Amino acid sequence: MTVVGNPRSWSCQWLPILILLLGTGHGPGVEGVTHYKAGDPVILYVNKVGPYHNPQETYHYYQLPVCCPEKIRHKSLSLGEVLDGDRMAESLYEIRFRENVEKRILCHMQLSSAQVEQLRQAIEELYYFEFVVDDLPIRGFVGYMEESGFLPHSHKIGLWTHLDFHLEFHGDRIIFANVSVRDVKPHSLDGLRPDEFLGLTHTYSVRWSETSVERRSDRRRGDDGGFFPRTLEIHWLSIINSMVLVFLLVGFVAVILMRVLRNDLARYNLDEETTSAGSGDDFDQGDNGWKIIHTDVFRFPPYRGLLCAVLGVGAQFLALGTGIIVMALLGMFNVHRHGAINSAAILLYALTCCISGYVSSHFYRQIGGERWVWNIILTTSLFSVPFFLTWSVVNSVHWANGSTQALPATTILLLLTVWLLVGFPLTVIGGIFGKNNASPFDAPCRTKNIAREIPPQPWYKSTVIHMTVGGFLPFSAISVELYYIFATVWGREQYTLYGILFFVFAILLSVGACISIALTYFQLSGEDYRWWWRSVLSVGSTGLFIFLYSVFYYARRSNMSGAVQTVEFFGYSLLTGYVFFLMLGTISFFSSLKFIRYIYVNLKMD
């Protein structure tokens, strides 16, 4: 039976995409709010808890000795919420729309010394809980710790046994939710003997207030602790300063390079006119620089299958990154929604697999590749295999520690199904179209059978120096923005400056292209025609600088600790650097290829 001709088979292939679309929870740009009447019950879900400085080290809230129902009922979650480590469950809190609660008992508890020690350890590690009300996350600390360094030394630990919920509404919708511990004192957990029990009474209160804000997205998150709105001016000044430096650098490189190149073309073409009567074998006599290697500059490189796979996957991630930023600019990612970006990234990755297959197969056929099936397999494996290995290690560590970040088996099967039934087939389909639409490689100069000997190169034209220059300059263009992104991904902040992000992303690609052209010109001027892989490695090394920055961020800009958070941070930071290597290596290669074709087309030759 042929899959292509079977409508039912095609529907099975697109079924996971529909699941992903439904898994985002709501349509693009639509806020997931519920309409209430006065007195309607408002369900509060408990979610996860974990160290404040380790956002990816999360555990279920009911793993702590806290008030919980006799039978725990879990909320049905979307794919993005599961990937975000959410494990929502119903709680004992009774909240009704627009009905204030002065003080209500949640439960009475008798804690053993072991349970008290568990709470003490959680408070010492600054455990930070998350509840969810009407799809709005509300967060707070489990307890309070006071450390005194003066004599006599004191170390006090207390548990918050009363929570005050503040909810704002507009009409029949909840706009904002928050939790605080105002006007209460923590219950001391100190001085308990091993054979003693500690009696606790958990209480809560609810305050409702009306607001004129009509949409949740208009509610400034900076009002409850975010640092981005308060430092927006400094943020903009830093970005503008970085852009000015980048524009000066790009302008300097472009002007100098164009003047030198114009002089080279004029000199070479003049020499060609004076020696036009000479034979083809004498064409190179008296020449030097990039003209003399015109018969070798388009000589195909080794490992062409791997090169084409890098270009294909790099093009895919360029499309994926652009798509995510554009969707964010269009308001499709509400900051209050859980896992929306995760779901969108998986959906776009599966759909853009056709781009990697097309670009890789198209260029592979152009440069004379014959092992088409191997090229497709290499293209599909170039990112998926490193990602799977990294995820396996990270997920195993989470599973061993009982973290909610460990994916359930059903989610793993769903993701595997998406890749097998959507991602891989689209890669093959894109490869077929790319192979069939490929024309012969358009080389302005013929290539001789015998390769020219490359003269010794000075140290400043080595691959390492090119990688250092080509990686550092693009990295410097995004270094300021990188801090804010890291503070969002690996911290407790929220990033909403998508316009700046789009602009910086465009600057990054532009700088990478300009630097690649400059470095390729300097390489060809030294009569070194091995530019194919060099162009990929030079600017692609920006990914290495990003990984080195992640090491610096972990050591000097964050308070992350522990095996769970450390393994996840460095595992996915290494993967992020690899993705940037693929993206910028692709931009660098095609920029150099376009430049080389331009200069040799404009060179007069017999």
Curated annotation (Swiss-Prot):
InterPro entries: EMP70. The chain crosses the membrane at residues 237-257, 310-330, 339-359, 373-393, 412-432, 469-489, 499-519, 535-555, 570-590. Its main location: membrane. It comes from the Eukaryota. Residues 1-27 form the signal peptide. The keyword Transmembrane helix applies. Keywords: Autophagy, Cytoplasmic vesicle, Glycoprotein, Lysosome, Membrane, Signal, Transmembrane, Transmembrane helix. Plays an essential role in autophagy. Belongs to the nonaspanin (TM9SF) (TC 9.A.2) family. This is Transmembrane 9 superfamily member 1.
